[in-house]
Amino acid sequence: MSRELTALDSVLEIERQVHEQETNLKAQLQKAERRKKLRSIMLTTPLVCFILLTFAFPILDMLFRSVDNREISQSLPQTIQALESWDYQGQPHQEVIEAFSVEVLALYQSKELPKIANRMNIEESGMRSLLMKTGRKLSRLTSLPISVTQLAKLDKRWANPKYWAAFKNLSGALTFSHYLAALDLQVNEFGDIEPQPEKRQIYVDLFFKTFWMSISITLICLVMAYPVAYLLANLPDKRANLLLIIVLLPFWTSLLVRTTSWIVLLQNQGVINDLLIWSGFTSERIQMIHNTFGTVVSMVHILLPFMILPLYSVMKGISPTYFRAARSLGATPFIAFMKIYMPLTLPGIGAGALLTFILSIGFYITPALVGGRSGQMISNMIAYHMQTSLNWGMAGALGGLLLFVVLVLFYMFNRVVGINNLKVGG
């Protein structure tokens, strides 16, 4: 019996040692896997940091600027606090006027009033001149604060509640006034949302025009790129490579050079008009630049390779036996193409269309140079607010709306077609 117990103990000891070895081996494998993952993460860290610094953070900063309103609440804190009890009816009470006069004078003396005046002028036209005039006159007074009547004597416009409503509407640290303006809406003197005056309703129409032009450019690129991609995929390699170099040639040329070349071709005294006059096709020169036509033509030329390449890569992977099998079963060439070949190219169509549409909807330099006033897109208005009017909040709101619409379209595209079905390579 003791011999059997000794043998059993030996077996158990061996099993324990085997189990410990397996545990140690698993721990070593897990440690090795963690090292591999850490090494992979370290290799991708520069790329992640680059994307965050150049892509994610600028977008987040743009979205924050579109709603940031700390400038008013920090510059006029007592006035904003006193306006909380005002109900948009009649003149604000004396406490508001007293706080306002003291704070405006302090801003005028510290040279900070022009910045606030510019911000308020965005919300209500005429506020810049009103605030600067009020600041100058307050600096000449011997005693402060002043009364409601005295403020109205400085400028009679202070008797109009709409100017006080502008301050109350901007009382919070965050505001959606830029987004309302981007949708051609405004907050009136009673605190209600209403449409902008007709002469100031420009952004919604410009958004629709931008989407219409982007869709048109995408469809034209698809119609032109499909036969070119088909030819590339079915030619012998030697000829296909030569044609592919021609397709890629625009990428080796500056975008500015390609855009200005269309100015040379399309202008009234340009090459195309000269050929039309010489051939007798027309006796008058045709306006083909500084309009929507010029923008569409030049952008189709610039974006065409982005449609050709995804189509070509997908078509290259389609076996010709499918088409021949359909023909051998009695299908006409048209039926075989529509029911067999074209459905197989849908991933390439989706990838090319999505890429072309996203690029065209945010294009800036070509509409700016070729489009003129009638051929501009929403990107040109964003650039105007960033460079000329310096209204970064409005630029951020327009960019935010454009980003939102693109994300909605991307989501719808994913639900209908499926992002997993897109292909940019064979």
Where are these predicted regions, by residue range?
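Transmembrane-helix boundary motif in ABC transporter permease subunits
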Residues: 28, 32, 61, 217-248, ...
